[in-house]
Amino acid sequence: FTALKVIRAYYADHNQPNRTVVLAADTAHGTNPASCTMCGASVETVRSVQGQTDLEHLREVIQHVGAENIAAFMITNPSTAGLFDVNIKEIADIVHEAGAMLYLDGANMNAMVGRIRPGDFGADAMHYNTHKTFSTPHGGGGPGADQLSDTSH
């Protein structure tokens, strides 16, 4: 939720308040559409094929919605099925070409800690939950104990 609010604020600050659509992979964490709705964004779902984002469908959705209206593409990687989307760099390129941001939901970040750096595959913003990634109590012992990261822009 917070990263989406930051993304929306970024575009409002850069005279692009029309960017109110968030694309979400059909493999994304189940709470992602609710987060989008809570911060005033509409959601368009992008299909997957065998757990991998359908790149052609991603392009079609961008064309249908209009690149100028898209704030971000939200993906959980690895997905809730435990699959790593191997096309993540190409996804980032497609999303960035549309002028949008790649938002990584790190719900399953524990599979990647110490192995890869999400910034290397083009994530502009991400969060991860300490209760899943580092085995802390849900909420990290108190509400709101998540990590939020973003790029310099």
Model-derived segments and their meaning:
Residues F1-H153:
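Conserved PLP-enzyme active-site core in the AAT-like
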